[in-house]
Amino acid sequence: AIELMKKFLDAATVDFKANGNAEFYLKYMSVPKEEEIFQTLLLMKEAKFHIEITDLIIPKIGDNLEDARKLVRWIVENLGENTPIHFLRFFPHYLLRNLPPTPIETLEEHAKIAKEEGLKFVYIGNVPGHELENTYCPSCGKVVVRRYGIETLEINIDEQGRCKYCKAKLPFVMEISK
């Protein structure tokens, strides 16, 4: 399947829930072997896809910090430190209406772990206006892409893909239109 996808896709976002916890996947999603997701990610990397990870953090049943650390370590070791990860806020819906929205502090704890483990591009999603919606230069720490929700407000990357402030080369594949 990856070979077929290569003809049409350059990038993929792989969506985890509950930090990829095996028990969660079986109980809530009827996925018997979550390791197949990890194997697919390795095949995507081998096929040179740009990969981003999203992780829906669900309070009380899918927000374990040790599971987060385990997932992030796997990403760093297997996909690399430049792999973006987006920790997404959960909102009650459908069969999980009994749960509260994910506390922002919980998302921030997940982001802190991802940074501690070495990921350079860590985001928080579904929280418009949060500072971790933005992309920061790993060299100088300044905002290179400022966002609000899905809107891009400012890009501080030059035509050569470098930070406009410190000129560090950024690992992005993009075209900047004027």
Residue ranges and their predicted role:
Residues 60-178:
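Auxiliary Fe-S-binding modules of radical SAM enzymes
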Residues 1-102:
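Conserved AdoMet/S-adenosylmethionine-binding subsite of the radical SAM
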